[in-house]
A protein has these predicted regions:
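Histidine-acidic metal/acid-base catalytic patches
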Residues: 1-27, 46-53, 77-87, 112, ...
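Active-site-proximal loop/turn and secondary-structure-junction residues that shape catalytic pockets
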Residues: 10-12, 35-37, 61-64, 94-98, ...
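Residue-level marker of alpha-helix boundaries and capping positions
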Residues: 9-10, 36, 69, 108, ...
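Structural motif corresponding to the early beta-alpha repeats
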Residues: 2, 29-112, 125, 223-225
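Hydrophobic, well-structured mid-protein blocks that either form specific transmembrane helices
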Residues: 103-139
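Short, surface-exposed alpha-helical recognition segments that flank or form part
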Residues: 66, 105, 131, 193, ...
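Intrinsic-disorder/low-complexity, polar/charged segments
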Residues: 67-70, 103, 136-139, 146-147
């Protein structure tokens, strides 16, 4: 059975307690919490969510191909917070746009960053989102091959479909062994909207996950923090509710 949750970027005006309570009431009990460092204004409650296994992922903006000490320091800070709060995963990105080549310099930076993270000896694991440079399953596999390492994956289906230009089945076949979380959102490739109101093949996605017996995390990534014109979080929940029965 899949586990439902949402990202706190969908409710930037709510504190964690409000978000957790509303998510629990609405059938989306798990939270993906975005952080920027080890200081969090609700650290005690974040620890409670981690201990209750209601927060499994902290979201950072760290780009794995970035070569800058301050970004590695930020990653260490966020991962330390995750470890202190019993949160198993820290989300990372690619670090540059999909149109840029994944060249030897970026491959070397990625390997160095992953080696650095391993040297910290923290219990927390990195999890890669299909985002920016790695907005396709093919690119993700190139990263794994070039670094000699694999990572758990958040499959942002919107990015692989619109930016990576892969069909849902193509991305699934490439990433199936690594996916532990599926991000859901809708739009037309440029502008976002409520799930079911855009041109993303939502029905096809749910049918694919049903066929493959997917039983991981399902996260509503309603990007209201970045797109304040979007409806509020409750409307996003109601929109996804129309599809949940397919699983």
């Amino acid at each position: 059975m899949v586990k439902w949750g949402f990202s706190t970027i969908g409710c930037p005006d709510w504190n964690l307690k409000t978000a957790a309570a509303f998510g629990e009431k609405s059938g989306y009990p798990l939270l993906e919490v975005r952080v920027t460092g080890s200081d969090h204004p609700e650290k005690d409650f974040l620890r409670k969510l981690g201990e209750e296994k209601r927060c499994l992922i902290l979201g950072t903006s760290f780009g794995v191909t970035t070569d800058a000490d301050q970004y590695r320091d930020m990653l260490k800070s966020c991962a330390t917070l995750a470890a202190e709060c019993s949160i198993p995963y820290v989300r990372i990105f690619g670090g540059c746009g999909f149109s840029e080549p994944f060249d030897d310099e970026k491959k070397a930076n990625a390997k160095r960053n992953l080696e650095y993270f391993e040297s910290l000896g923290l219990p927390t694991r990195l999890i890669l989102e299909t985002h920016d440079l790695f907005s396709s399953g093919k690119r993700v596999c190139e990263l794994f091959e070039s670094t000699g390492r694999t990572l758990p994956v958040i499959w942002d289906t919107h990015h692989t479909y619109f930016t990576g230009k892969e069909s849902l089945s193509e991305s699934w076949e490439l990433l199936e062994s690594y996916i532990i979380d599926v991000h859901i959102k809708d739009g037309n490739g440029k502008e976002l909207c409520l799930p079911g109101e855009g041109i993303f093949p939502m029905t096809e996605l749910f049918a694919l996950l049903k066929e493959k017996n997917y039983a991981g995390l399902m996260t509503c990534e309603h990007e209201k923090m970045w797109h304040p014109e979007l409806p509020d979080m409750p409307e996003a929940f109601r929109a996804i509710d129309k599809f949940k029965g397919a699983l």
